[in-house]
A protein has these predicted regions:
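Helicase motor core with emphasis on the C-terminal RecA-like subdomain
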Residues: 1-143, 149-158, 173, 181-196
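Non-catalytic terminal extensions of ATP-dependent helicases
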Residues: 37, 62, 103-106, 113-284
Length: 284
């Protein structure tokens, strides 16, 4: 990433999928002497705003960020967008890459891909949707009294069930959506219905199960884009518009590689067709 960033003049954005990776890349570029800022959702609002303003005014050349950086970003002279890790899908990739070259001048959109990037997105996907057992456990706990005699809260559920926080959060989201539980402003949880059957709980997951399958397909399409040998613009437009362009873009890495191989093959064929001295003698 350092070599790519140094090779491209002008301002740019480096996207990472996780906060930890964003911080590591930011530190590496900073140590390399780059003018670089950091932006992710765990930073204080004031610090995020300061970094964004410095990037927009040109005080910082590079912004390393998670997908939290994007809304309202319209800097016309961004010369590159580098995805250090693969995003969750082509829509996100297109939107984030589309921040480059808005002034109409050439810009580079680069995706670095490693197989472990898929595992990162798969981890996020697994944490986004509850399993039946997790929903059952949260509901059963809410129907009982907390062991510490206090009100149920997210923290109390996490301590009681010893389950990941994000799993409990998504289970609570399902129950809130179906008006089974209410979460008050102070974090307290109160039951609105205590007569939900196991069958009803299972049916609540149907919509989430369908959405999960869609998100899984979206991820697989992103992996296909990263690994394909086809014209990347063709793959992207096929996803966005439902049909491929009539011609290849001739600017992506795959098209350029095909063009080089074609030119080499044509040159080799031309050399093979050139009569050799022995051929000339034989033909006389």
């Amino acid at each position: 990433a350092k070599a790519l960033v140094k090779a491209i003049p002008g301002s740019g954005i480096v996207y990472a999928a996780t906060v930890r990776t964003a911080e590591a890349v930011h530190e590496a570029l900073k140590q390399a002497g780059e003018s670089v800022g950091l932006y992710h959702g765990r930073l204080p609002i004031a610090q995020r705003r300061e970094a964004q303003d410095a990037f927009m005014t040109g005080e910082l050349r590079i912004m390393v960020a998670t997908n939290a950086f994007g809304m309202g970003i319209d800097k016309p002279d961004i010369r590159f967008v580098l995805h250090y890790q693969m995003p969750s899908g082509l829509d996100s990739y297109y939107q984030e890459s589309g921040r480059a070259g808005r002034d109409g001048e050439p810009a580079d959109c680069i995706l670095l891909f490693h197989h472990r990037d898929r595992a990162v997105q798969q981890f996020f996907l697994a944490g986004r949707y509850p399993e039946a057992k997790e929903l059952d456990d949260v509901y059963a706990a809410l129907c009982s009294n907390p062991s510490d005699a206090g009100p149920w809260t997210l923290e109390a559920l996490q301590a009681e069930l010893r389950a990941p926080r994000n799993k409990i959060q998504v289970a609570l989201a399902v129950l809130r959506q179906r008006r089974v539980v209410r979460q008050h402003a102070d974090g307290r949880l109160s039951m609105l219905r205590a007569d939900v059957s196991a069958e009803d709980l299972a049916s609540m997951l149907d919509l989430y199960r369908e959405k999960r399958e869609q998100d899984q397909a979206t991820l697989e399409q992103m992996v296909f884009y990263a690994q394909t040998g086809l014209c990347r613009w063709e793959v992207l437009l096929s996803h966005l518009q439902g049909k491929a362009p009539a011609q290849r873009c001739m600017t992506c890495d795959n098209c350029r590689r095909i063009a080089v191989h074609t030119a080499q093959a044509q040159e080799s064929a031309a050399v093979d067709c050139t009569p050799r001295p022995s051929d000339k003698a034989a033909s006389i």
